[in-house]
Amino acid sequence: MEWPWSAIAASSSSSSSCFFASPNSCLSITRRTNLSCVNTSVKSLRHSRFDSKHNLVKRRINGDSVVRRSTTSNNSTEETESSSSSSSVDCVGMGSDVECVNNGEDEENRSSGILSGGEGTFLEWTVLISPFFFWGTAMVAMKEVLPITGPFFVAAFRLIPAGLLLVAFAVYKGRPLPEGINAWFSIALFALVDATCFQGFLAQGLQRTSAGLGSVIIDSQPLTVAVLASFLFGESIGIVRAGGLLLGVAGLLLLEVPSVTSDGNNFSLWGSGEWWMLLAAQSMAIGTVMVRWVSKYSDPIMATGWHMVIGGLPLLAISVINHDPVFNGSLQDLSTNDVIALLYTSIFGSAVSYGVYFYSATKGSLTKLSSLTFLTPMFASIFGYLYLNETFSSLQLVGAAVTLVAIYLVNFPEGND
């Protein structure tokens, strides 16, 4: 059996540490010089200095343990095993998606986990796909109760209970609470952009457009992320991704045109559900690029939970000030189905979906997981049609198809660009 070895250098006292991405990430391995490794996922350099007294050590991943084989001075070989102290992937839940940062372990070297070899059981596929199912169907559930409860109440209810559940889960797991002004300031700003603005714009948009169409527009946010990452982090866009950006703009225009033409002279930008959804997508995109900053100061799961709680409070206040129907006596008019829909959007559409995505991201390939994002608008469209009789016009169908192709091109693997 072949092991996924990565060569590393370690001192005999085992006191030095180096963070390794993969065998292909090492720029140089020379004695008396710097050993530089690139974490290809976060595009950062880690350096350590070694001298000729250091021994060559090989490492393999064995489940949750790290097995190291070293050659001693008398040329004998010894093998030790140590447990991994933390997950190799950190994820932050944002908007209706999750942003994950690989902390260094090569995805392809994960011999155990969900669909690691491209095959999997029915249960594994169900777990892998379930977050996208929950996010898509939560859009339908939200739209169903919006007229009865009000948009801002639904947005707040989706965030606050789910956030408290995630915080409780993080405490149960022994995750550290945010500490210091930097941690809380970053979470608060992240909450304002990714929770308050995103969910508020989303709820406003759902009042004026279909769940399926809105979900397609929301999922166009990788187009904006690609542009922001290029300007802020110097990440290369490339020919294929640039083509995807142009195609994405064309697709979004095709999605918006039917709304403009149908309203004629009465068209108002702020009365357009597609426009509100586009604003929500931009909020989510900005939240995506903020993840790296937030994760520097806080545990990812804690940050996810607290940003949902903090971001939901302004929405609740706006709901009260705006006299949403739920505060004007309509609460007693809620049917059992309405209550179930509200609970579903919060528990399954937020807390459970984020938790399952976290689990899948740490057990399987992030590339495979991110390639399934197109399922969210697909589920939203299918269940919007089944339960709300929503349909796409011919032009909107073309626009949705063009937009989804553009999203795929923007997420195109860099090595193939």
Curated annotation (Swiss-Prot):
GO annotations of cellular component type: chloroplast; chloroplast membrane
Domain of life: Eukaryota
Transit peptide (first-last residue): 1-68
Pfam families: EamA
Annotated S-S bridges: none
Transmembrane segments: 122-142, 152-172, 183-203, 213-233, 237-257, 269-289, 301-321, 339-359, 369-389, 392-412
Keywords associated with the record: Chloroplast, Membrane, Plastid, Repeat, Transit peptide, Transmembrane, Transmembrane helix
SUPFAM superfamilies documented for this protein: Multidrug resistance efflux transporter EmrE
Membrane topology per record: Multi-pass membrane protein
Domain EamA per the UniProt entry, residue ranges: 133-255, 283-411
Comp. bias (Low complexity): 68-89
Protein family: Belongs to the drug/metabolite transporter (DMT) superfamily. Plant drug/metabolite exporter (P-DME) (TC 2.A.7.4) family.
Full protein name: WAT1-related protein At3g02690, chloroplastic
Species: Arabidopsis thaliana (Mouse-ear cress)
